[in-house]
Amino acid sequence: MAGKEVVILRIGHRPERDQRVTTHVALTGRALGACGMYLAASDKGVVQSVLDVAERWGGQFFCEDNIRWRTCIKDWKAAGGKVAHLTMYGINLPDIIEEIRPCEKLLVVVGAEKVPGEMYGLADYNVAVTGQPHSEIASLALFLDRYHDGREFAGEFPGAKIRIIPSRAGKQTEEL
């Protein structure tokens, strides 16, 4: 979204089993106002899938793999950014979002497998989305919607080659 830099850090990705979910984490972030995703694993397939979508559907979104997550967090904070870790063990989203929303540079950590305990100490905010086990994709979507206060629905995706024409029935797209 305009003026804010939101980037996802995906940790714990297992290439042999998490490709679809990690791709959907990136695409959800892209659609809901994130600028890009750092992937703390090597998976060129995920990176290429995400970049292909960004190329066709427009907008500025990067995806980089082989990121060392501890270094990424350290560098992000050194550059003045804040870190929000999505977890079912944090402070409930409605109780902390007003504190997070003013952050102009935000790294959102989304785990796949069990997240190392040190993440809770590295994060500026440990954010629970319901405090119940569910999808990391749903957590990211709800978090970004609350963070952007619904403004992501009016987002523009410059450079798109295709766009959807809203319709009550059927699928309508337009080549640009």
UniProtKB/Swiss-Prot annotation:
<dbReference type="InterPro" id="IPR002845">
    <property type="entry name" value="tRNA_mtfrase_aTrm56"/>
</dbReference>
<comment type="function">
    <text>Specifically catalyzes the AdoMet-dependent 2'-O-ribose methylation of cytidine at position 56 in tRNAs.</text>
</comment>
<comment type="subunit">
    <text>Homodimer.</text>
</comment>
<comment type="similarity">
    <text>Belongs to the aTrm56 family.</text>
</comment>
<keyword id="KW-0808">Transferase</keyword>
<protein>
    <recommendedName>
        <fullName>tRNA (cytidine(56)-2'-O)-methyltransferase</fullName>
        <ecNumber>2.1.1.206</ecNumber>
    </recommendedName>
</protein>
<dbReference type="GO" id="GO:0106059">
    <property type="term" value="F:tRNA (cytidine(56)-2'-O)-methyltransferase activity"/>
</dbReference>
<dbReference type="GO" id="GO:0005737">
    <property type="term" value="C:cytoplasm"/>
</dbReference>
<dbReference type="InterPro" id="IPR029026">
    <property type="entry name" value="tRNA_m1G_MTases_N"/>
</dbReference>
<keyword id="KW-0949">S-adenosyl-L-methionine</keyword>
<dbReference type="Pfam" id="PF01994">
    <property type="entry name" value="Trm56"/>
</dbReference>
<keyword id="KW-0489">Methyltransferase</keyword>
<keyword id="KW-0963">Cytoplasm</keyword>
<dbReference type="GO" id="GO:0002128">
    <property type="term" value="P:tRNA nucleoside ribose methylation"/>
</dbReference>
<dbReference type="InterPro" id="IPR029028">
    <property type="entry name" value="Alpha/beta_knot_MTases"/>
</dbReference>
<feature type="binding site">
    <location>
        <begin position="111"/>
        <end position="115"/>
    </location>
    <ligand>
        <name>S-adenosyl-L-methionine</name>
    </ligand>
</feature>
<feature type="binding site">
    <location>
        <position position="86"/>
    </location>
    <ligand>
        <name>S-adenosyl-L-methionine</name>
    </ligand>
</feature>
<keyword id="KW-0819">tRNA processing</keyword>
